[in-house]
């Protein structure tokens, strides 16, 4: 089938209408699921996921796991270790599955990012070069050798959040960011997570 430009434009227009309708319907379901139109429409949407030292979207460092679960943001692991363990995004929360939230004594203390789909507020992400981090963060970036892998690095951003006891820690393979985490000190620096 050969399609002229006018037909292609018309097809593209209808495709956009369908996508917009689905997106609108999904947002409506989010409002229903959360039980509050203001919560879903507050402008703090989880679909535009960015991370900073304070958390991601509605999930903030210092928030209790109970609050995050009751708001439909995180799942509770029934066999969770009360001292330190991880919780993960609830289905329908709008958060990528590749985020992990460290819970220490019932409170969220850090978010671990293992997906390139999530950036920091400054635009840094997995796959970025060490030079890009240096460009973004400048003098705020502190470099140190990786605990287990020679040639790899931790690149830590304290910046203004240092007075609040929070940081972002990027792990690199000596060239590119392989993962990062953000949250409260000292937990954000724990290399083994809860291990």
Show where each model-derived region lies.
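C-terminal motif of bacterial Sec signal peptides marking the signal peptidase cleavage site
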Residues: 22-25
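N-terminal low-complexity, Pro/Thr/Ser-rich intrinsically disordered segments
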Residues: 33-66
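Short, low-complexity, Pro/Ser/Thr/Gly-rich segments in the mature regions of secreted, periplasmic
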Residues: 183-195
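Second-shell loop/turn segments in exported
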Residues: 52-58, 117-124
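A cross-family detector of function-defining hotspots
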Residues: 33-35, 63-104, 125, 130-176, ...
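Bacterial N-terminal signal peptides that target proteins for export
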Residues: 2-13
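Bacterial signal peptide processing site
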Residues: 27-29
